[in-house]
């Protein structure tokens, strides 16, 4: 499980950790963690699930989704880095937009479509019935935030090196993302 996002000590540790990364010189950081970067990710762990303590459950229930609890935490981090973009995933249990909590102005939502059936045949996000809930979530997030990145999975996870003829779908997805004034991340 992810850490408890309602733990009052967690933002302090996350802010210090991120600040140390940002303060490092270029020679001290790996290529993937360029300290001059404008975007920094503060996101949930991959595939673990959210904290289910009483405080987190209450927060999740209030916002109708664990994304609200995540955003409350991320907003605390973003407040300390006003000149950086703090990106966070809308992914698995945080994909549904919260009812009340809104991202800070420097928080970027990175929508991920991994839950939808994309194996074998690739279906376009804009028109496929399989992606109806993703489209709804995308619209809902668009109502409450300034910037959304879309992480479109353009790979077949069952066999990473096999040919995956998805160029036409990629184009459809880029066009639909551009049409909705979002930024595509592939």
Regions found by a protein language model. Name each.
Residues 180-186:
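Conserved small/polar residues in nucleotide/adenosyl-binding loops
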């Amino acid at each position: 499980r992810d850490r408890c996002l309602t733990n009052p000590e967690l933002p302090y540790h996350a802010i210090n950790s991120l600040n140390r990364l940002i303060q490092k010189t270029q020679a001290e950081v790996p290529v993937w963690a360029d300290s001059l970067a404008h975007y920094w990710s503060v996101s949930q762990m991959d595939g673990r699930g959210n904290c289910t303590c009483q405080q987190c459950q209450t927060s999740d229930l209030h916002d109708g989704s664990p994304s609200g609890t995540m955003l409350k935490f991320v907003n605390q981090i973003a407040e300390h880095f006003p000149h950086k973009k703090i990106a966070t995933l809308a992914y698995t249990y945080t994909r549904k937009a919260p009812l009340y909590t809104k991202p800070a102005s420097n928080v970027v939502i990175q929508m991920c479509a991994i839950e939808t059936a994309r194996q074998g045949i690739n279906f376009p996000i804009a028109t496929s019935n399989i992606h109806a809930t993703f489209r709804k979530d995308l619209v809902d997030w668009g109502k409450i935030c300034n910037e959304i990145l879309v992480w479109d999975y353009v790979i077949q996870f069952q066999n990473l090196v096999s040919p995956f003829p998805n160029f036409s779908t990629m184009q459809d997805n880029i066009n639909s993302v551009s049409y909705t004034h979002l930024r595509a991340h592939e």
